[in-house]
């Protein structure tokens, strides 16, 4: 099951490269907040490193770029932009003074490269990426082997003669470590060693909770929110839909099982906006991607998106994006 879940990271990264090459990303609003001028270069550089290490992964990327449908690029755009902007706003609110410190903990980070932009933008940020060992080994090998990434993340030390022996990245402000985040015996010692429970923490779970069994997801939320005195959780996931005639969730489950033998155990448990946000403590806010598209994007940005690829089925966007949510939670002990 772990291996199958890890494959979804390659899908997500492939979709992001497609959205970047077709100019969906970065968005106009991302460009306004700064430090996105190297966004494309960072991702294409990482993609080049993938090509030299895994033909299969690179083939998936090129296939996604050749055959990506507008709805997929819109989805990647909304997913990426909504998370980035909510994270940016929270960091700005909590880093008003030069001495302020916060930490970002990305649970199930995969190939996500957000840390490059945010570490450059916010000197008061510490960043911790966690994922399964195989994912971390592959990502850390690229980060530690590439001169541009080493300079950006201030990675020191010689590269091991055997790249496969690289299992982490540890610098003053950035750590990438292997961890099964659903195992408290692995997770808690890492958080104790590399984070400060008295410092405000942002927790990112991007399409992570949906792949966990309900008990494991609840345990993860309870463990993490119980450790930090103040925190902000950003979670992005699909929801199955709660209306009687809504078959989105069941169709999605059938397709995943048929194509990958993969399940989303809580897709139909937390199948509505209200049910999804109730799983978190503290004050939570939730928004579907359709609502985000309709009410958050400026008219000029929606018009820009329409010029990138021909899209004739706006109703399809509404159906799909009404079943993806971004949920944010503030808590304080």
From Swiss-Prot:
<keyword id="KW-0808">Transferase</keyword>
<dbReference type="InterPro" id="IPR029063">
    <property type="entry name" value="SAM-dependent_MTases_sf"/>
</dbReference>
<feature type="binding site">
    <location>
        <begin position="180"/>
        <end position="181"/>
    </location>
    <ligand>
        <name>S-adenosyl-L-methionine</name>
    </ligand>
</feature>
<feature type="binding site">
    <location>
        <position position="131"/>
    </location>
    <ligand>
        <name>S-adenosyl-L-methionine</name>
    </ligand>
</feature>
<comment type="similarity">
    <text>Belongs to the methyltransferase superfamily. LCMT family.</text>
</comment>
<dbReference type="GO" id="GO:0018423">
    <property type="term" value="F:protein C-terminal leucine carboxyl O-methyltransferase activity"/>
</dbReference>
<dbReference type="InterPro" id="IPR016651">
    <property type="entry name" value="LCMT1"/>
</dbReference>
<keyword id="KW-0489">Methyltransferase</keyword>
<keyword id="KW-0949">S-adenosyl-L-methionine</keyword>
<feature type="binding site">
    <location>
        <position position="206"/>
    </location>
    <ligand>
        <name>S-adenosyl-L-methionine</name>
    </ligand>
</feature>
<feature type="binding site">
    <location>
        <position position="79"/>
    </location>
    <ligand>
        <name>S-adenosyl-L-methionine</name>
    </ligand>
</feature>
<comment type="function">
    <text>Methylates the carboxyl group of the C-terminal leucine residue of protein phosphatase 2A catalytic subunits to form alpha-leucine ester residues.</text>
</comment>
<feature type="binding site">
    <location>
        <position position="108"/>
    </location>
    <ligand>
        <name>S-adenosyl-L-methionine</name>
    </ligand>
</feature>
<dbReference type="InterPro" id="IPR007213">
    <property type="entry name" value="Ppm1/Ppm2/Tcmp"/>
</dbReference>
<dbReference type="GO" id="GO:0032259">
    <property type="term" value="P:methylation"/>
</dbReference>
<dbReference type="Pfam" id="PF04072">
    <property type="entry name" value="LCM"/>
</dbReference>
<protein>
    <recommendedName>
        <fullName>Leucine carboxyl methyltransferase 1</fullName>
        <ecNumber>2.1.1.233</ecNumber>
    </recommendedName>
</protein>
